[in-house]
A protein has these predicted regions:
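Small-residue-biased structural context
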Residues: 1-139
Length: 140
């Protein structure tokens, strides 16, 4: 049923993302500071990832507090009024998703496909790997 699907999405994606995004944001900032002089694009990567972190956090909170209750009402009532109440929220969430996709594309470009500038440096390798994993997880 619909409630089970929503609970599955929250467990499978949202809980992990809400745990991981702030930690990864800290690591991205550390990487940016470490390579500030040699790799100036890492400053932009840090800025873009902070945008993703902020947008995803708000996105998830909005879905849980506003969209899911409206969605369940729509499934229960299947009425035009429930659909109209839900529609602007869905439009906004789709716009947020487009922003996130755009920011990840920029990060991918700035990092040459998430290629570490120093493959012998664990922080660099870790951050690039986690950025790519997050892009994959968010895009699916």
């Amino acid at each position: 049923d619909q409630t089970s699907i929503i609970k599955y999405i929250e467990r499978k994606y949202y809980e992990d993302l809400l745990d991981e995004l702030p930690v990864l944001n800290d690591y991205v900032e550390k990487l940016s500071k470490k390579y500030k002089k040699e790799e100036v694009e890492y400053d932009k990567v840090a800025e873009l990832f902070y945008n993703i972190y902020r947008e995803m956090t708000v996105h998830i909170e909005t879905e849980q507090s506003d969209v899911y209750p409206l969605l369940l009402t729509y499934y229960e009532e299947n009425s035009d009024a429930a659909y109209e109440a839900l529609k602007p929220h869905i439009t906004r969430l789709l716009d947020e998703h487009k922003n996130i996709v755009h920011w990840f594309k920029q990060i991918r470009s700035l990092t040459n496909g998430y290629t570490p500038v120093d493959s012998n440096e664990p922080l660099n390798v870790f951050v690039m790997k986690k950025l790519e994993e997050n892009e994959d997880n968010i895009m699916t």
